[in-house]
């Protein structure tokens, strides 16, 4: 099972809010997930990002692959693989 760290869209129409989740790569974007490790709100100024670093590092060490957007969020937050 390939595990990805990716964004799950929440919020209203034209007002997106994202949760950073760990999910099977074959699961739909807003479908079943394994764990929630944070959130990302692109509409606030400055952009609001909260990541549980302990959980994120645990999943990265277990082999979960972050998507490109999540990699960028991790780098901005100071988390590196």
Swiss-Prot record:
SUPFAM superfamilies: Ribosomal protein S16 (SSF54565). GO terms for cellular component: cytoplasm; small ribosomal subunit. It comes from the Bacteria. Keywords: Ribonucleoprotein, Ribosomal protein. GO terms for biological process: translation. GO terms for molecular function: structural constituent of ribosome. Gene3D superfamilies: 3.30.1320.10. PANTHER family: 30S RIBOSOMAL PROTEIN S16, SMALL RIBOSOMAL SUBUNIT PROTEIN BS16M. Belongs to the bacterial ribosomal protein bS16 family. This is Small ribosomal subunit protein bS16. It comes from Clostridium beijerinckii (strain ATCC 51743 / NCIMB 8052).
């Amino acid at each position: 099972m390939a595990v990805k760290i990716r964004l799950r869209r929440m919020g209203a129409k034209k007002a997106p809010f994202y949760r950073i989740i760990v999910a099977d790569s074959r699961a739909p974007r807003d479908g079943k997930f394994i764990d929630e490790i944070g959130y990302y709100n692109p509409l606030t100024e400055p952009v609001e990002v909260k990541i549980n670093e302990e959980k994120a590092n645990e999943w990265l060490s277990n082999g979960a692959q972050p998507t490109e957007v999540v990699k960028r969020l991790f780098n901005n937050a100071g988390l590196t693989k």
